[in-house]
């Protein structure tokens, strides 16, 4: 009985193996765990076929376990450290670049010889318009304004000035200021001042016509003769400056030690050597404090009026051009070191005889590029060439685009903007039609017909300083006398007159505090958030992790691909087998038909074939029939059921499947 019981137990163990904690060996226990656990990855180690797949899943599972231990260790260390963090930071802001320009671009004593004829013509024109009898400029200009014969009328020929008297239909009745003849003119009217041409009498203007087509004209009208003369004067002024070399223009401008009298920064003394020359086409010699060309940038350690830049500027109002600069003072612009100072558009003006205090607040803005916005990072993806050699800005792109169109349409470059390679500045002698071309092109630019506004895009990052300005009378009555004496002594030989407070301006520019504001864009839904949300949904509803995702990839992409490939292979093999069988069945089964009588070729001249009743004799039986010239169909090859060609294909298919499973 004992032997039979042992045999029964062994048979049960063989047919029904014990699993789980009752497994007899550690290998069987691990195998059972991997087959029944909810931990992803372990089951794939057991069920995967092929050593390569098995080792891949072993490595992935071990890496996941190592990451879990590492992260848990960090969490435990952080939890049991029982520490509190206190952060105290002392911030220092880089002091921005400050560009300072005199509103008068050139000393009149240095440029008067080049502008003498233009100034005479302008002065005489004003006398004709308003009937002045006294000289309109001071005698120190050394101009004989009463000698009309000495004044050339070339400027009035190029751009004729007129007085608008009346309107008849679509034509204007004007009085030419040179010939005093009344004529009717027609063309496109551009009103540069507020109001309407129909509602204004005695308006002043000038006419620009195409040199190649005199009937194509543009008429500019102004409600005030001051604005008309200034606009007319500036057109001729730019034409004269376009023919002067850069070296001569720098020599005619103000030097740093002439413009800057005293300087303090952060409580320390500075001088003209801390300023960098920057020549502006409209304001002449300007000077930039804390420029990147000086090397290390200065920083502000504290906020407040005592820790900024303090300068006293010598304006020298007596050297002002009366028709170009009608306001006296200076203009400043706060900007980043790698930005071009568009001081004519963004600058802040300083008055003479006052102390101007400007508090700054820095704002840094950063926008997201494509696909969140249409901004550009550095302008490299813009088709417009940067003519300023500075950091890309929208204003740089627009000006460069207009200058490019100016060179393409008019053949020359405008004086107010940088010169492109291979181009020349416009002047009457070489390009007599440039002013009309410029006015027409600028109108198209303003109306966004040149495509510059659609081509140029905003920069994704930029810095902006918000300025708060306050004014005070400077110097005071009690301190005026001694301060002017001291400053006159410091100017020394540069000063050839008695100094007054209207010749000076005091500037104090500083950070209000060292708190900068940062405005940045961030995507509300990025790839990290997307993956986290996907992982949360899969873990909540399917208890699925990253390893589970890899299992899905293996089954639904890799294994499914091989299953479909095997199915296609089986179909191909079956098609090949059926094709071979069909080829065998198409061969016809040819047999010799039974023929009797004279239709049988073997019975020719035979007694039996002749139908004779008597049996053949021995002699007639020996007479064999002659061979007939006829082809007897050959017997087809036999069909052997033992030739099983499909079995060979079946064996190849089995081998191929085994090869696939080995992967």
From Swiss-Prot:
Signal peptide: none annotated. One of its GO terms (biological process) is sodium ion transmembrane transport. Disulfide bonds join 101-286, 209-217, 263-270, 375-460, 397-456, 401-452, 410-437, 412-426. Keywords: Cell membrane, Disulfide bond, Ion channel, Ion transport, Membrane, Sodium, Sodium channel, Sodium transport, Transmembrane, Transmembrane helix, Transport. Coiled coil: none annotated. It catalyses: Na(+)(in) = Na(+)(out). GO terms for molecular function: ligand-gated sodium channel activity. Residues 1-55, 566-663 are cytoplasmic. Residues 77-544 are extracellular. Originally identified and characterized by its inhibition by the diuretic drug amiloride. It comes from the Eukaryota. It is a multi-pass membrane protein. It is found in: Apical cell membrane. GO terms for cellular component: apical plasma membrane; plasma membrane. The chain crosses the membrane at residues 56-76, 545-565. Component of the heterotrimeric epithelial sodium channel (ENaC) composed of an alpha/SCNN1A, a beta/SCNN1B and a gamma/SCNN1G subunit. Belongs to the amiloride-sensitive sodium channel (TC 1.A.6) family. SCNN1G subfamily. This is one of the three pore-forming subunits of the heterotrimeric epithelial sodium channel (ENaC), a critical regulator of sodium balance and fluid homeostasis. ENaC operates in epithelial tissues, where it mediates the electrodiffusion of sodium ions from extracellular fluid through the apical membrane of cells, with water following osmotically. This is Epithelial sodium channel subunit gamma-2. It comes from Xenopus laevis.
């Amino acid at each position: 009985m004992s032997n039979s019981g042992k045999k029964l137990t062994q048979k049960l163990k063989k047919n029904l193996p014990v699993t789980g904690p009752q497994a007899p060996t550690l290998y069987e226990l691990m195998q059972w765990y991997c087959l029944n656990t909810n931990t992803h990855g372990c089951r794939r180690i057991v069920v995967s076929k092929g050593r390569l797949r098995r080792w891949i899943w072993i490595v992935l599972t071990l890496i996941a376990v190592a990451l879990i231990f590492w992260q848990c260790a960090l969490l435990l260390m952080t939890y049991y450290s029982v520490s509190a963090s206190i952060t105290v930071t002392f911030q220092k802001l880089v002091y921005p670049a400050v560009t300072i320009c005199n509103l008068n671009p050139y000393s009149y004593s240095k440029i008067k010889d080049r502008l003498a004829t233009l100034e005479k013509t302008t002065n005489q024109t004003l006398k004709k318009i308003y009937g002045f009898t006294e000289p309109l400029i001071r005698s120190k200009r050394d101009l004989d304004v009463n000698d009309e014969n000495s004044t050339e009328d070339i400027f009035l020929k190029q751009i004729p000035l007129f007085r608008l008297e009346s309107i008849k239909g679509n034509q204007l009745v004007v009085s030419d200021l040179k010939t005093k003849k009344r004529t009717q003119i027609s063309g496109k009217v551009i009103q540069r001042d507020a109001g309407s041409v129909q509602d204004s009498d005695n308006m002043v203007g000038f006419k620009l016509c195409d040199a190649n087509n005199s009937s194509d004209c543009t008429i500019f009208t102004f409600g005030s003769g001051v604005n008309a003369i200034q606009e007319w004067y500036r057109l001729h002024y730019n034409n004269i400056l376009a023919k002067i070399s850069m070296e001569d223009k720098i020599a005619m401008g103000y030097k740093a030690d002439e413009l800057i009298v005293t300087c303090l920064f952060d409580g320390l003394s500075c001088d003209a050597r801390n300023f960098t020359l920057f020549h502006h086409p409209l304001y002449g010699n300007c000077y930039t404090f804390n420029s990147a060309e000086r090397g290390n940038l200065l920083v502000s350690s504290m906020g407040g009026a005592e820790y900024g830049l303090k300068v006293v500027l010598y304006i020298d109002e007596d050297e002002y051009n009366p028709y170009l600069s009608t306001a006296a003072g200076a203009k400043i612009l706060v900007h980043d070191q790698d930005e071009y100072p568009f001081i004519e558009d963004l600058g802040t003006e300083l008055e003479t005889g006052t102390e101007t205090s400007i508090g700054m607040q820095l704002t840094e803005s950063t926008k997201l590029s494509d696909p969140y916005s249409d901004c550009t990072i550095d302008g490299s993806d813009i088709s417009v060439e940067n003519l300023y050699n500075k950091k890309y800005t929208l204003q740089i792109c627009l000006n460069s685009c207009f200058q490019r169109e100016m060179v393409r349409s008019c053949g020359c470059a405008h004086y107010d903007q940088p010169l492109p390679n291979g181009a020349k500045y416009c002047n009457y002698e070489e390009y007599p039609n440039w002013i009309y071309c410029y006015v027409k092109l600028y109108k198209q630019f303003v109306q966004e017909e040149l495509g510059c506004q659609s081509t140029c895009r905003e920069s994704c990052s930029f810095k902006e300083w918000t300025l708060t300005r306050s004014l005070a009378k400077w110097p005071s009555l009690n301190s005026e006398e001694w301060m002017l004496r001291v400053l006159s002594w410091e100017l020394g030989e540069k000063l050839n007159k008695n100094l007054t407070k209207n010749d000076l301006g005091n500037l104090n520019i500083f950070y209000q505090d060292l708190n900068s504001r940062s405005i940045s864009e961030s995507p509300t839904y990025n790839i990290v958030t997307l993956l986290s949300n996907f992982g949360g949904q899969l873990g909540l509803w399917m208890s699925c992790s990253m390893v589970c995702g890899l299992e899905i990839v293996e089954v639904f992409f890799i294994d499914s691909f091989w299953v479909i490939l095997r199915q296609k292979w089986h179909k191909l093999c079956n098609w090949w087998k059926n094709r071979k069988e069909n080829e065998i069945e198409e061969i016809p089964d040819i047999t010799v038909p039974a023929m009797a009588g004279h239709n049988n070729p073997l019975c020719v001249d035979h007694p039996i074939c002749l139908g004779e009743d008597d049996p053949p004799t021995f002699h007639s039986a020996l007479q064999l029939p002659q061979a007939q010239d006829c082809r007897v169909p050959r017997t087809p090859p036999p069909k052997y059921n033992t030739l099983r060609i499909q079995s060979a294909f079946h064996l190849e298919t089995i081998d191929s499947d085994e090869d696939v499973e080995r992967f």
